[in-house]
Amino acid sequence: RVVMAEQKSHVEKGAALAQVQPEGEHHTAERSVNRGRKILVFAHVGRKEARDAARQACAQLYKAGLTPVMTRSDLETLSENWDEPVPVQVVHESVALIDIELGVVLGGDGSILRAAEMVRRTSIPLIGVNLGHVGFLAESEESDLSETVRHIVNSEYTVEERMAIDVEVWNDGKRVHSDWALNEASVEKANRE
């Protein structure tokens, strides 16, 4: 089971996605209400636009009273040249994975799949903000980042399930590989000619 968060589209049963509620169904969370809420910010920190987006998301979350959380490696990369850093907690060190409410993924489909791998045995929903070339799994674009974070701050999302599958490859009666996949898996020839 993989739990993912999403803003707009309908999702198949299996993994959870959060959907932003339509206008008119919002409730406003005050800063004191947000205290204690922990949001995982997962970014493709090898790309400048993802580092900038992560800094922006962390600052916006912190300003609203939420606790931004990142992996140690992402935070170390992000901390370089951060003009106005905000306090960010480290998952598995100062914050347990089970205490995270939601993960926001800043990158393309590859980043979303890596984040899904991290949280797949939990009930943490993920919401993807597309910064990559392929964004089939993301629910919003980089230009919508502030609005997406505002929806997270105000708890303006619902969680839906998405299908995750276990994959096994067998050869001559022996299992040679097993893994999991989100939506689909494919088998290709070893030699592509």
What are these regions (language model features)?
Residues 1-11:
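Short beta-strand segments of a lipoyl-like beta-sandwich/carrier module
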Residues 17-45:
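Generic N-terminal amphipathic, Lys/Arg-enriched alpha-helix
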Residues 45-46, 109-111, 134:
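Short glycine-rich anion-binding loops that position phosphate/pyrophosphate groups of nucleotides
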Residues 50-51, 110-116:
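Short glycine/serine/threonine-rich phosphate/pyrophosphate-binding segments
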Residues 66-73:
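Short internal beta-strands
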Residues 87-100:
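Short acidic low-complexity segments
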Residues 122-140:
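Short, acidic/small-residue loops that bind anionic groups at enzyme active sites
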Residues 136-193:
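Catalytic core of DAGKc-family lipid kinases
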